[in-house]
Amino acid sequence: MSLFEDLINSKIRELEELKSNLLIDIETRIRKEATAVLNKYSTQITNIESEVALERERILYSAIIEARRKIVETYEQILNDFIETIYNEVDKLRGSERYVKFLRFLIESAINYTQTKDVIIYASPKDRGVVETLAKNLGITGFVIEKDIKGGVIVMTRDGSITVDYSLETLLSNKLEELKHLIYLETHER
């Protein structure tokens, strides 16, 4: 019986070894498949996280650009309102001694620059009478023509070789950067 038992025991050991190897093989396959699935989903999760981060950055960038655009629009509106206020103040001052002195100063400065009193002076229709009186008092031999300007004067030599633009629009335009800076300071001090 020993031979028979040895044979049976040998087969039992083979089956147990096969069973053990089969369990190890199945466990290895399951681990490989699980690792592959985890890697696949980890890659997908990483890609999704990257997409979310990019989308978040795009949304933030768009929001910053939109905020800056609105700030610029607001500053432009403030500047336009400020300039309109200046034009309205000039309209209120027209005919006052202060405004007449201002026009006289502009005309005298332009005459000094052109080095001649034989000039054409362009003025707002609202200022024409005052400018004609000032020109006469200053001994200017040219004439005054109405022009569509908000205030101030434009003085030109008769031959057109020299033009001095002291219109209110040009004076404000020359001060535009300073006005922007002042508005910026006023709005950021609060």
Curated annotation (Swiss-Prot):
GO MF terms, alphabetically ordered: ATP binding; proton-transporting ATP synthase activity, rotational mechanism; proton-transporting ATPase activity, rotational mechanism
Cellular component, GO annotation: plasma membrane; proton-transporting two-sector ATPase complex, catalytic domain
GO biological processes: proton motive force-driven plasma membrane ATP synthesis
Broad class of the protein's primary localization: membrane
Subcellular location: Cell membrane
Keyword Cell membrane: yes
HAMAP family the UniProt entry points to: ATP_synth_E_arch (MF_00311)
UniProt-recorded name of the protein: A-type ATP synthase subunit E
